Amino acid sequence: MKEVINCFKENNPLFNKPLKEVSVEEGMEIAKELFEILNERKDGIGLAANQVGIDAQVAVINVREPIILINPKYVETGDEIPYYEGCLSLPGKAVHTKRYNSVVIKTAQDDSNWYFSGAPNPTDGQTGWEKQERNKNDQELRLLETVCIQHEIDHLNGLNIMDRQVISTITNKKIGRNEKVTITDGQETKELKWKKAESLVESGVWKIV
């Protein structure tokens, strides 16, 4: 079984180049292998072919359900939001990025477009505490899935989180020290001023949502 190439230790010539398009049949075979690698590692939610040394426009994701991307293309994008993300190919590294809160994509294996959105539903949080919690958790998962889609498509186009990095400190006024941000560790969500949230986010455990 192939392994994810650690780009801090090994050269991966495919990491920074657009990958070639493949047939649906070949893409499905590659996707099967990628899922096996991802499931074996148990520390990631998405994987692109070039991360294991395969030159093919194929990636897989498993957040809410397994998703296969073969030759994916953007059809439509939503509003940009701040995010904080890492990468299996750059272990221990996480950076602030800007991502779309919704995307519509087209893949080679599907006739219809796919819509992914992490934006709140109009009825989210309107009735009952338990419903609010369910809606909040569902929104966080939908947003994570939407960001992961973009992360993997970046890989297929020769981009990575370092290409998407934005500096989120008071020095460049991306986020003011007294500006409130929402952060999550996957279990709990908090709304804090950036001056209190910054150290939590930089620890890598918490991320901006």
Q: Which role does the model predict for each range below?
A:
Residues 1-179, 191, 198-203, 209:
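Positively charged
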Residues 188:
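Extracytoplasmic/periplasm-facing segments of secreted or lipoprotein envelope proteins
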